[in-house]
Design a protein with these regions (language model features):
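Residues forming the Rossmann-fold NAD(P)(H) cofactor-binding site
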Residues: 109
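C-terminal "cap" of GNAT-fold acetyltransferases
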Residues: 3, 7, 128, 132-174
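Acetyl-CoA-dependent GNAT
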Residues: 5-94, 99-100, 112-114, 118, ...
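Residue-level signal for beta-strand positions within conserved beta-sheet cores that form or flank
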Residues: 89, 125, 165
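Conserved GNAT acetyl-CoA-binding A-motif
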Residues: 119-131
Length: 174
């Protein structure tokens, strides 16, 4: 049985940091494998340094400006996902990640639906996200939920020199 647990930095901070390191290691390994890049060298940072440099805004997300969920399956943290409001009506889906052993079980779709539902409760009528071009399973989930490709948006956390390897998507509820 799965459970979505709202992130509490007093309880989950270390696990959330570990999940983000695992997520970033996966992102950069796939980026390098799919495009023959040495992306970390181009950024001049290690994965833990990148996570430490980018984690603080996530640790401060609180409803109704945003929320982070951890997906717990049989007592184990199986995945994560976040929503951050970019404006009164626009939310961004961020850091959707399932650990490899939990992929293919529908948890990504369930997490996305949870984040969209909460985003609507927070007043969002439009949602944005970015996803790697090689992440076909994730793209399928997003397209099935009504997301369509759009141009880059300035709030994306993807470094400008890596954006050509990502898709940017948006879903409008109107």
């Amino acid at each position: 049985m799965e459970e979505f647990v709202p992130f509490d930095p007093n309880i989950h901070k270390n696990e959330f940091i570990r999940m983000n390191i695992e997520y970033m290691e996966w992102i950069f390994s796939q980026l390098d494998e799919n495009y023959q890049l040495d992306s970390l060298s181009k950024l001049g940072m290690t994965v833990p340094e990148i996570v430490n440099a980018t984690i603080e805004p996530f640790l401060k997300l609180k409803p109704p400006e945003g929320i982070i969920y951890l997906l717990i399956v049989e007592g184990d943290v199986a995945g994560m996902g976040a929503l951050e409001k970019l404006s009164d009506e626009v939310g961004e889906i961020k850091r959707m990640y399932s650990r490899p052993q939990y992929r293919g079980r529908g948890y990504g779709k369930i997490m996305l639906n949870r984040l969209l539902e909460v985003g609507r409760q927070f007043g969002c009528s439009s949602f944005r996200l970015d996803t790697p071009k090689w992440a076909h399973a994730a793209q399928h989930i997003y397209r099935s939920a009504g997301f369509k490709e759009r141009e880059e948006y300035p709030e994306s956390e993807i470094p400008p020199n890596l954006r050509s390897y990502w898709l940017f998507m948006e879903k409008n509820n109107s």
